[in-house]
Amino acid sequence: MHMPSKTNNIFLLSVLLTPQAEKKRQLNVSTHPHIYIVFRQQELTVFMMIMISLLLLASLLPHLTFTARVNVGIVNGTEAKPHSRPYMVSLQKYKKHICGGFLISDEFVLTAAHCWKGYPEILTVVVGAHDFRKSEDSYRVEVKSYISHPHYTFCSLQNDIMLLRLHEKVKLNNNVTWISLPKECEDVKMNTLCSVAGWGRLWMKGPSTDRLMEANTTTIKNKVCKCKWGSDFQASQMICAHGDGGSCIGDSGGPLVCGNTAVGVTSFVDIKGCNSPERPNVYTKISAYLPWIHQIIRNIK
């Protein structure tokens, strides 16, 4: 996760350092906020021990239920129907998810520029995935070329877009295919219901998910976004959206999808929290970069 030096209000949504496998959280009775027990073990009868065990179990049930309920979405999201978004890919470092991305052809992935820190960092792309715990429907592809927008810099919020050329063309099937891009200079209308998806965290400091999650979000007026973000928002290059659900850390690079078209690339959110009510999430506007995208693909082919 990177916090640009130019502002104190922004989080880019990539996982910049390779995350270790998240350890299962263990409940320590003595430090649990709702439980405090002091006793001398030799004074406990079997009956008392049983009663205490039952009381502990009863006190934990609400927390266990809550965990099971919230551990199913990015931010207020729901689990996507398996392979209903066959364009989605996972960008990984040392086989750990750090960012999202999406296929725009059988050879190219579009993602956020801040997801890659430059050589010698090596990323791989996992296609056809839904649940990372089940690998039978997915496979890993090496990246041949990293092509960040020429005007993107690490500390900049602008031009946060990158093409990845895959080392080999993906095999297209029901679980793997690309998504359409908008036409040049085609802007999505405000108040359009769109969606985001990813394998990112469930909240700012929460755990990530093994399953692809999705959430609805609605585009908002540029004037409103400019008022919220100030000079950090550039209407010619960015789109703002907000809703009950939204992107979080690890969702960077995934698409903002309106209809069946990818119109934006997940870029940054308010530092106060993922899907903050104070500031809408910001996406790189794909239509503004179509000439660059098409030129790169033409030159390579």
Residue ranges and their predicted role:
Residues A68-G73, L91, V109-A112, W116-F154, ...:
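Conserved H-D interstitial segment of serine endopeptidase catalytic domains
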Residues I147-T153, K169-L212:
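Active-site substrate-binding loop(s) of clan PA
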Residues G77-K81, Y152-F154, K205-P207, P280:
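Conserved, non-catalytic sequence blocks in retroelement Pol enzymes and Pol-derived host proteins
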Residues M162-E168:
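Conserved beta strand-loop-helix elements of the APE1-like EEP
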Residues H2-P4, N8-L27, I37-L110, L123-A129, ...:
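Protease-domain processing segments flanking chymotrypsin-fold serine proteases, especially trypsin-like
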Residues M88-Q92, T192-K301:
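Extracellular trypsin-like serine protease catalytic domains
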Residues P4-K6, T18-K24, N28-T31, D187, ...:
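C-terminal helix/juxtamembrane-tail motif
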Residues S84-P86, P120, N159-I161, N174, ...:
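Extracytoplasmic
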